[in-house]
C-alpha cells in the first residue's frame, strides 16, 4: 500500500519520539497488501465492491509487534465514553493514538475529535488518522470516510493551540487495480453490505 501524503494539522512544542512513531506507522502501512501474501496492494476496481475492515489488519499486527496496544480505551472526560482507539503507543505515561478509518465520514470526524479532546485533556499527546484517497474510496464500501471529504475541515483543527501536541492525517491508496483479484470481504454492519 502506498502513502499519498501526510497532512500535519498540529505540530506544537515537543512531542517525544515523533520520528520513531511516524516511522513505525509508515512501515506498518507499507505492510498492507492484497490479496493477502502479495507484495503490494492490488484492489479489484468494482465501484463500492470492497470491504474496509480487513485492510487494516496487517498494519495493526505490525504495530502490535512494535509495542503498540490495540483497541485501547482512553478515558477522556467523565461524561464521555468514547470507543477504544485502534492503536496506542504509550510515551511518558501519555498516549499517542492511531485510528484507521473503517466507518463513514461522521466516524472520521469523531476519530479526530476524540484525539483532539484527549490532547485538550492532556491524556493524548498526539494522533494520526489514516484515510483512503478519493480514488481508493470509489472501490470501497459506500460512504466510507476519505481524505478529500475531510480536507475542508483541516483548517478547523489547525486552529487548536495545543501545547506539546501532534495531529496528522495520512492519505493511503492502492498500488494498482486488477479485475482478476478477489474482492475484499465486507462486514455486515452499517453501510458495509451496500
Swiss-Prot record:
Record GO terms (molecular function): DNA binding; magnesium ion binding; type II site-specific deoxyribonuclease activity
Positions contributing to Mg(2+) 2 binding: 71, 86
Record keyword S-adenosyl-L-methionine present: no
Positions that bind Mg(2+) 1: 86, 100
Cofactor note: Binds 2 magnesium ions per subunit.
GO biological process: one example: DNA restriction-modification system
Reactions accelerated catalytically: Endonucleolytic cleavage of DNA to give specific double-stranded fragments with terminal 5'-phosphates
Enzyme superclass (EC): hydrolase
Active site feature: 101
UniProt cofactor(s): Mg(2+)
Stored SUPFAM superfamilies: Restriction endonuclease-like
E.C. number(s) listed in UniProt: 3.1.21.4
Pfam families in alphabetical order: BamHI
Origin superkingdom: Bacteria
Alphabetized UniProt keyword annotations: Endonuclease, Hydrolase, Magnesium, Metal-binding, Nuclease, Restriction system
InterPro entries for this protein: BamHI/BglII/BstY (IPR011338), Restrct_endonuc-II-like (IPR011335), Restrct_endonuc_II_BamHI (IPR004194)
The protein's assembly and partners: Homodimer.
Protein name: Type II restriction enzyme OkrAI
Amino acid at each position: 500500500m502506498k502513502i499519498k501524503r501526510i497532512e500535519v494539522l498540529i505540530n506544537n512544542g515537543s512531542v517525544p519520539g515523533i520520528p520513531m512513531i511516524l516511522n513505525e506507522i509508515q512501515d506498518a502501512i507499507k505492510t498492507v497488501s492484497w490479496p493477502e501474501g502479495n507484495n503490494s496492494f492490488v484492489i479489484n476496481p468494482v465501484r463500492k465492491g470492497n470491504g474496509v475492515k480487513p485492510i487494516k489488519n496487517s498494519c495493526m499486527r505490525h504495530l502490535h509487534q512494535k509495542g503498540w496496544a490495540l483497541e485501547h480505551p482512553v478515558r477522556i472526560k467523565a461524561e464521555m465514553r468514547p470507543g477504544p482507539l485502534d492503536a496506542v503507543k504509550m510515551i511518558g505515561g501519555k498516549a499517542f493514538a492511531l485510528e484507521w478509518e473503517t466507518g463513514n465520514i461522521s466516524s472520521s470526524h469523531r476519530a479526530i475529535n476524540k484525539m483532539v479532546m484527549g490532547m485538550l485533556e492532556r491524556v493524548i499527546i498526539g494522533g494520526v488518522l489514516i484515510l483512503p484517497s478519493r480514488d481508493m474510496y470509489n472501490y470501497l464500501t459506500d460512504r466510507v470516510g476519505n481524505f478529500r471529504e475531510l480536507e475542508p475541515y483541516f483548517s478547523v483543527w489547525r486552529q487548536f493551540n495545543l501545547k506539546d501536541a501532534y495531529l496528522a492525517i495520512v492519505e493511503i491508496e492502492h498500488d494498482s487495480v486488477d479485475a482478476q483479484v478477489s474482492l475484499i470481504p465486507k462486514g455486515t454492519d452499517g453501510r458495509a453490505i451496500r
